[in-house]
């Protein structure tokens, strides 16, 4: 009987830490809580090509979304079409340079015909790694000023659409980009405030104080193919949607 009790005690001591360890592994990291995957790693389920073409520009290879540029600009659009406030994380790389891509947010059809879509654009293009491309916010906003918010800029747009730019301390530099390798991006969009980082360092950000009627309040998330012949790869795409539309949280 004593031997049996001793064996049970030893087994109990051995199992307890294993269960505890498993529980710990099951818990998401604090900075990943609330995020869900946007990509199943095998198919493009939940995504749609725009415009639709006979020659598919987007595919999945070895758990990676691969985009190959054809005639005109192409987009891969996430299934949820009216997203306003959210955080998005992903990794990207360009197997060959130069190449240009980015992510449109709050995108919708451009009724003026200037572009296919109006949107705020997270620019991650490696076209000489210039300040006007990589790490910038682009404004694809017909009918109003299309401001410059380059890598390292903090832009504030007042109610009259006048810009003020200051510099972000510790912003990512061209030398800190993995040319030809994977780079991690984190986009945060809340109300009228927008920012993103690359490899854990701030890239650029802006705040708009325009009337709501002049701002883009919600829309699609689109991965972009900018040029013919280019290749871009995406993986580990995940998103946390906070609200369809909402006010800016304090202390953001």
Question: Where on the chain are the PLM-derived regions?
Answer:
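Positively charged n-region of N-terminal signal peptides that target proteins for export
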Residues: 1-6
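Bacterial N-terminal signal peptides
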Residues: 7-17
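Carbohydrate-interacting regions of secretory-pathway proteins
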Residues: 20-252
């Amino acid at each position: 009987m004593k031997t049996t009790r001793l064996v049970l005690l030893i087994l109990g001591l051995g199992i307890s830490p294993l269960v505890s360890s498993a529980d710990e592994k099951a818990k998401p990291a604090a900075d990943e809580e609330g995020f869900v995957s946007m990509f199943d790693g095998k198919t493009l389920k939940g995504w749609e090509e725009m415009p639709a073409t006979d020659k598919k520009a987007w595919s999945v290879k070895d758990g990676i979304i691969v985009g190959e540029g054809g005639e005109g600009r192409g987009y891969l659009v996430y299934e949820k079409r009216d997203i306003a406030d959210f955080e998005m994380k992903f990794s990207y790389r360009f197997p060959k340079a130069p190449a240009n891509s980015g992510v449109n947010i709050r995108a919708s059809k451009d009724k003026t015909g200037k572009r296919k879509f109006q949107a705020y654009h997270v620019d991650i293009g490696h076209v000489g790694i210039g300040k006007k491309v990589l790490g910038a916010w682009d404004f694809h906003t017909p009918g109003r000023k299309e401001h410059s918010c380059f890598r390292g800029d903090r832009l504030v747009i007042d109610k009259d659409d006048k810009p003020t730019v200051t510099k972000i301390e510790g912003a990512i530099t061209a030398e800190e980009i993995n040319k030809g390798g994977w780079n991690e991006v984190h986009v945060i969009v809340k109300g009228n405030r927008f920012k993103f980082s690359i490899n854990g360092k701030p890239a650029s950000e802006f705040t708009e104080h325009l009337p709501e009627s002049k701002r883009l309040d919600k829309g699609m998330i689109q991965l972009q193919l900018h040029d013919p012949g280019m290749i871009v790869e995406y993986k580990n795409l995940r998103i946390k949607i906070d609200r369809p539309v909402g006010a800016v949280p304090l202390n953001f």
